[in-house]
Amino acid sequence: MESMGNNSPGPEIRALARNIRMSAHKARRVINQIRGRSYGQALMILELMPYGACYPISQLIHSAAANANHNMGLNKANLLVGRVEVNEGAVFKRIQPRAQGRGYPIQKPTCHITIVSEEISRSNDPIMSIESRKKGYVWRRK
């Protein structure tokens, strides 16, 4: 009987950030730009984007790379940002005082971000592979 789970050959390289104080759609705007990129490219993109969501996402990518290095002995240059999910978290509800004793409701959304990285040699992308050279990255077709 076949398993219904993940079909990847090795264990997952995961990093999870929970209850990040930003809305999920603002985090997805940034996440969609780095999905499928290499570790170095993802960090360069995040450094140049002018959004506040870039900082916690870059911290999470650093954490995933540190997990891969510490737990599996993989090199950071060989990592690829694979599956990335942004889910909505709890909503903090607050009240802003208004005139004449009224209260104005404020909702402060949170989100959960999950990054699953994979090694470039194990990636399932048949079109492109990336090789590390002395002068950065060289794209080649398989």
From Swiss-Prot:
InterPro entries: Ribosomal_uL22 (IPR001063), Ribosomal_uL22_bac/chlpt-type (IPR005727), Ribosomal_uL22_bac/org-type (IPR047867), Ribosomal_uL22_sf (IPR036394)
Keyword tRNA processing in annotation: no
Sorted UniProt keywords: Chloroplast, Plastid, Ribonucleoprotein, Ribosomal protein, RNA-binding, rRNA-binding
GO MF annotations, alphabetized: rRNA binding; structural constituent of ribosome
Subcellular location: Plastid, Chloroplast
Cellular component terms per the entry's GO annotation: chloroplast; large ribosomal subunit
One GO-annotated biological process of the protein: translation
Gene3D superfamilies per record: Ribosomal protein L22/L17 (3.90.470.10)
Family assignment from sequence similarity: Belongs to the universal ribosomal protein uL22 family.
Function: This protein binds specifically to 23S rRNA.
Cited PANTHER family: CHLOROPLAST 50S RIBOSOMAL PROTEIN L22-RELATED (PTHR13501), LARGE RIBOSOMAL SUBUNIT PROTEIN UL22M (PTHR13501:SF10)
Subunit text: Part of the 50S ribosomal subunit.
Name used for this protein in its record: Large ribosomal subunit protein uL22c
Source species: Pinus thunbergii (Japanese black pine)
